[in-house]
């Protein structure tokens, strides 16, 4: 029997990923596309994987380390405004902020009448506007001759500490007094005369390293001195105004902005009496901030640099079509506000419905506390049961995305897990009766925590792994919240939870990862990508929970070996998950050449679940892996024509996805397959996680340049002419926070939103 895997309300929890709070300055979701032009960043070498066992399916460089030498590339569109070095004079209107750290000292008299002094650091933030004088304006016309220098004088006051006086106490000891002093300071920001002023787009940090020395006289009349190094790092972001107009390109230029930082330095020395003395001096540090306006995009290759050393253009797609269906149209009005409002409403409803399906429930009183039902439906179809997989994914979503995960519900779920592990079922005896873990592979249970004994697809080996992942997150939450577990349940500490529940599920993975089982759709018995990847993730996550004394234990060594074995098995072409015949991940290789194509949304679900945080990036098949992204492309391509709901005449935006192209399950029986909320949301989640990863980690976008490097996703869904740039096995690298990067991220955002727009429109049409 087939089943839909998760109730629709549970699936909607995946929508949480669409509201991750990306920086709007980096990703202007609602703005139209514009041209991107830049050139000439320096290249740096590849970085290796952080784990020796994790060999990927493709060679993907890390965010900032790439091989080869540089060439020039630009991103543009015939309908967009080119940002290039130009003869236009523009106004720099964004202020820059300079932070000065100084030391402030003051004096006071103690109870013995002695004068004492104390010092503390002080940080002064000064705004230095990179702007033209009020008389200048930015016009939409070009200049024919160099302009005069524009110098802006900014006056401010620096609070510093100065030497005041010395005095001699009764015992002959000399004390020094310091006073706080206000020093008027002038910063000059100069935009040098030039016939070509180019857009300032990057935050440019400047670091000044200097050595500061000072002298002082101790009570014996000796002169002491001390020196210390000091590093001053200042970031001055600038941007051009909005009324720009370009005519013709010229060579990139570099603009220097000169200013002076006035600060107070301190140093220490030891006098003849062995005492440590401190002296302060005021120091003016001339500083020049240099803005190089030529950075942007770099081409490099898998095996060698492009032979063409001239510049080339990569054009972003304005419209994406698949068999006549508009996936997204950048030229049309793309207003994300209605979608955002709908997502916020739906998130609230989704959380409410999820908790209604977890016992104790006022809506379904027969559900025991901690039991998660797959669906409230009890006839046509009857899914009023609990599945290990569904329960774990539900709890995982609650802990990961709910502001209030309801700790008592989590503890009740742990209690259910504890007892199900120790309950006999059709696969064998519970772990309370034997050390054999085979019974943990039973996927389906009654809502009263008794075994379901009717025929079913057994075993399903992903359940214990998914349960481990969810419970490890619960352990983290308990530790962070400081929750007292009390004596109500059979575990009184997080150590008990790990030893009495998680350890047994890990033992199951060690014993049975290389054994056949049914897939997550409960249809095919074999070895499956989804099962293996979540098993790998569970083992990998668990290793950080062992204390120092356990890390050399035989059990932990078994876990490490299992991690190596699963990783190697997944990426070995001989096992078929990566197959030269296909440009996507194969879910179940044993049927790929006979019953199915192997294309399956479960591969995206696996990547989304395993790579939900940057800490898992060392595991294979990350969300930026070309194999994962190309799988999404092929799912869209195949399912566009399968389902009538994707007919362009019914809805002009987006593609609804199903489980796999050959699916004939309609939610109750065998007939005609259909799209699923779970599958469509999974596609959005993959892309949102891709965006979030690059922004939060400040990673460059790395795009393979041809089919040998697997670029179907990029060439068919993002760029319009990627395959025409050359035949070498190359990469297109879009540096973080450049115009090329930001506008490409916007395209991916539109593609991700298109799936939810499709979902929203369909539900509104049907009244859901």
UniProtKB/Swiss-Prot annotation:
Keywords: Carbohydrate metabolism, Glycoprotein, Glycosidase, Hydrolase, Polysaccharide degradation, Signal. Residues 29-83, 125-149 are annotated as: Disordered. Gene3D superfamilies: 1.50.10.10. GO terms for cellular component: fungal-type vacuole. One of its GO terms (biological process) is polysaccharide catabolic process. It is an enzyme of class 3 (hydrolase). Residues 693-768 are annotated as: Y subunit. Residues 349-692 are annotated as: H subunit. PROSITE patterns: GLUCOAMYLASE (PS00820). Belongs to the glycosyl hydrolase 15 family. This is Glucoamylase S2. It comes from Saccharomyces cerevisiae.
């Amino acid at each position: 029997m087939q089943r839909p895997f998760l109730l629709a309300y549970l699936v909607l929890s995946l929508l949480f990923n669409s509201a991750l709070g990306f920086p709007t300055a980096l990703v202007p979701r609602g703005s139209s596309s514009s041209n991107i032009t830049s050139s000439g960043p320096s290249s740096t070498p590849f970085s290796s994987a952080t784990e020796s066992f994790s060999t990927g399916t493709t060679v993907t460089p890390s965010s900032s380390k790439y091989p080869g030498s540089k060439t020039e590339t630009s991103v543009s569109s015939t309908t967009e405004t080119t940002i290039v070095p130009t003869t236009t004079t523009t106004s720099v209107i964004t202020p820059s902020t300079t932070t000065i750290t100084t030391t402030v000292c003051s004096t006071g008299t103690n109870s013995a009448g002695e004068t004492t002094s104390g010092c503390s650091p002080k940080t002064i933030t000064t705004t230095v506007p990179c702007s033209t004088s009020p008389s200048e304006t930015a016009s939409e016309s070009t200049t024919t001759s160099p302009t005069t220098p524009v110098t802006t004088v900014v006056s401010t006051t620096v609070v510093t500490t100065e030497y005041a006086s010395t005095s001699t106490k009764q015992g002959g000891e000399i004390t020094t007094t310091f006073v706080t002093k206000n020093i008027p300071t002038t910063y000059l920001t100069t935009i040098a005369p030039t016939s070509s002023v180019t857009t300032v787009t990057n935050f440019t940090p400047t670091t000044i390293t200097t050595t500061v020395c000072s002298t002082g006289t101790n009570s014996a009349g000796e002169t002491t001195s001390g020196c210390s190094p000091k590093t001053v790092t200042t970031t001055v972001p600038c941007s051009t105004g909005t009324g720009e107009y370009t005519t013709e390109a010229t060579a990139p230029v570099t603009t220097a902005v000169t200013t002076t930082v006035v600060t107070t330095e301190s140093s220490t020395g030891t006098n003849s009496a062995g005492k440590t003395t401190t002296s302060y001096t005021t120091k003016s540090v001339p500083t020049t901030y240099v803005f190089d306006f030529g950075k942007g995009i770099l081409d490099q290759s898998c095996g060698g640099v492009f032979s063409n050393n001239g510049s080339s253009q990569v054009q972003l797609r304005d419209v994406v079509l698949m068999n006549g269906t508009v996936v997204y149209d950048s030229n049309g009005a793309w207003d994300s506000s209605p979608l955002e409002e709908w997502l916020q409403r739906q998130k609230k409803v989704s959380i409410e419905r999820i908790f209604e399906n977890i016992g104790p429930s006022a809506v379904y009183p027969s559900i025991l506390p901690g039991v998660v039902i797959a669906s409230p439906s009890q006839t046509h179809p009857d899914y009023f049961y609990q599945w290990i997989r569904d329960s774990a994914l539900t709890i995982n979503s609650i802990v990961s995305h709910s502001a209030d995960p309801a700790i008592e519900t989590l503890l009740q779920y742990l209690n259910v897990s504890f007892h199900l592990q120790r309950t006999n079922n059709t696969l064998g005896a519970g772990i309370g009766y034997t050390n054999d873990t085979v019974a943990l592979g039973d996927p389906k249970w009654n809502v009263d925590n008794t075994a379901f004994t009717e025929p079913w697809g057994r075993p399903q080996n992903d359940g214990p792994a998914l349960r481990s992942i969810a419970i490890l997150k619960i352990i983290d939450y308990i530790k962070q919240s400081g929750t007292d577990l009390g004596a109500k349940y059979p575990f009184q500490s997080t150590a008990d939870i790990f030893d009495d529940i998680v350890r047994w599920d890990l033992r199951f993975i060690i014993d049975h990862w290389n054994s056949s089982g049914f897939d997550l759709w409960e249809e095919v018995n074999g070895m499956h990508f989804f099962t293996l990847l979540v098993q790998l993730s569970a083992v990998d996550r668990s290793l950080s929970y062992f204390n120092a004394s356990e890390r050399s234990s035989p059990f932990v060594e078994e876990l490490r070996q299992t991690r190596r074995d699963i990783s190697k098995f997944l990426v070995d072409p001989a096992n078929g998950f990566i197959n030269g015949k296909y440009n996507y991940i194969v879910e179940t290789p044993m049927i790929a050449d006979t019953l199915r194509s192997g294309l399956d949304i479960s591969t995206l679900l696996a990547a989304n679940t395993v790579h939900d945080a940057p800490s898992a990036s060392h595991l294979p098949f990350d969300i930026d892996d070309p194999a994962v992204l190309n799988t999404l492309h092929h799912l869209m391509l195949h399912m566009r024509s399968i389902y009538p709901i994707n007919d362009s005449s019914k809805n002009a935006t987006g593609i609804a996805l199903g489980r796999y192209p050959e699916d004939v399950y309609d939610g109750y029986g065998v007939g005609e397959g259909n799209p699923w909320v779970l599958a469509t949301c999974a596609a959005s989640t993959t892309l949102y996680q891709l965006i979030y990863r690059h922004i939060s980690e400040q990673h460059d976008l790395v795009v393979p340049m041809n089919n040998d490097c697997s670029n179907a996703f990029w060439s068919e869904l993002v760029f319009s002419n990627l395959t025409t740039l050359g035949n070498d096995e190359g990469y297109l690298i879009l540096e973080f926070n450049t115009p090329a990067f930001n506008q490409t991220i916007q395209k991916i955002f539109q593609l991700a939103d298109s799936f939810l727009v499709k979902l929203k429109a369909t539900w509104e049409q049907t009244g859901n």
